[in-house]
A protein has these predicted regions:
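Conserved active-site and cofactor/substrate-binding residues in soluble primary-metabolism enzymes
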Residues: 43, 58, 62, 91, ...
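A structural signal for small-residue-enriched, beta-sheet-centric alpha/beta enzyme cores
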Residues: 109-110, 139-241
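Glycine-rich phosphate/diphosphate-binding loop of Rossmann-like nucleotide-binding domains
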Residues: 80, 84-108
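N-terminal amphipathic/basic leader segments beginning at the initiator methionine
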Residues: 1-43
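Catalytic-core regions of hydrolytic enzymes
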Residues: 109-137, 142-143
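An N-terminal, well-structured beta->alpha segment
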Residues: 34-71
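Short glycine/serine/threonine-rich phosphate/pyrophosphate-binding segments
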Residues: 87-91, 119, 146
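N-terminal charge/polar-biased segments
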Residues: 1-12, 55, 65, 69, ...
Length: 241
């Protein structure tokens, strides 16, 4: 039984690619066999973990490198801010599109969620891609972790797209090359954890009653804003400067 998580590093051991005083970058590649076994998409997963003393600039540089490596050459980038703008723990993508500087190279889109608009995020993104024809789509979303200490501190980049809502069991149509016809890279941060995970971390037994209860930290407003600031700067550094 695997934990409920969006973080590949919590399902398979990776290799440490780079380590600084306050950050650690871990790379994981899931092949077809791994993907089937773990229920995740094939591809490369880059995780940059930061401790409490990490400098934002240090994080930005490491994430920008990961974005450039997974995206390849991109003259036009569509940044898609996924999530519900009315829920703090789910508004990471929306905040990133608010903070990022758009222009000739970077375009931003906030499709919101089906429960708010009545339209699938995929349909909105597909329609915009058909018009502006980006070289790469970068999808930004809040993630779920199976480890409390990674909340707001572990940034994950995936080379093969994202399934919106997967971390909380609300799977939507996947955003990837196969569905959109364009390269899709995702970046996100875990901002929620299941209560059952916390109980198990504290030595308790798995409780089915807790399997649907999702918990966020009390300082979630600060965390989501800081993470959005870091990601928006990393995107600008990767694709503009």
């Amino acid at each position: 039984m695997y934990p409920i998580t969006d973080m590949a590093m919590e399902l398979k051991t990776g290799s440490i690619r780079r380590k600084t005083e306050h950050t650690v970058r871990t790379d994981i590649t899931l092949d077809e066999k791994d993907a089937r076994r773990l229920g995740k998409a094939q591809g490369t997963y880059i995780t940059v973990e930061a401790d409490a003393d990490a400098d934002n600039d240090e994080l930005v540089c490491s994430l920008a490198d990961g974005l450039k490596e997974t995206s390849g050459r991109a003259d036009k980038v569509l940044v898609v801010g996924l999530g519900n703008p009315h829920l703090t723990a789910d508004m990471l993508g929306n905040l990133v599109t608010d903070k990022i500087e758009t222009g000739e190279r970077i375009k931003a889109l906030r499709p919101s969620v089906t429960g708010v608009t009545g339209i699938e995020s995929f349909d909105v993104v597909k329609g915009v891609c058909n018009v502006i024809k980006p070289d790469v789509v970068v999808a930004v979303d809040s993630l779920a972790s199976a480890t409390v200490s990674r909340i707001g501190r572990a940034f994950q980049i995936c080379s093969s797209g994202i399934t919106p809502g997967s971390g909380v069991g609300n799977h939507r149509i996947r955003l990837c090359y196969e569905t959109l016809g364009v390269k899709v890279v995702s970046i996100g941060v875990p901002l929620v954890v299941y209560a059952s995970t916390i109980a198990e971390e504290c030595g308790g037994k798995p409780d089915g009653k807790l399997s649907e209860l999702i918990v966020t930290p009390k300082d979630i407003d600060y965390l989501v804003d800081r993470c959005a600031e870091v990601i928006s700067k990393a995107l600008s550094k990767a694709f503009v400067t």
